[in-house]
Amino acid sequence: MAVGGLAVAGVAIGGFVFFMTSSSTFGKTLPPTGFSAAHLESLPRQQINIQPIPRLEQEHVMERAAGHERGSMLVQYNCVEYQCEPDLVEQLTEIVLNFPEYVYLAPYPTMDAKIALAAPGRLLTLDTLDKNKIRKFITDNSNR
């Protein structure tokens, strides 16, 4: 059984139950890089969002035919579970606004990363703000 990224198993011996755990990447919450048939047929209303984008809407952002010639991209951050620099959102906003409107910025307070960038079929997670890596990811995936 997986619990919060841990594999948990119980063994009963002589009336006692012993639990074993091991770390696993299975079960992590990260932005989607594709979409399912059940995704929402809507895109975020604006490029810079102060509220989280619903998961099924995030999936539609990954759909190549979602109103853009190319697949859109998500730049998301989690300042609830991770300690963020006071100006992190401001710096991410500055980066995103230098790209076309199909690059979206939003908080994602339940993801298992401080910063995550998602494009169709691609994902980059960062523990610290790296403007060069973020710009490169967006540029490299803009024409795919």
Regions found by a protein language model. Give the residues of each.
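Helix-rich interaction surfaces within compact, conserved domain-sized segments
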Residues: 95-144
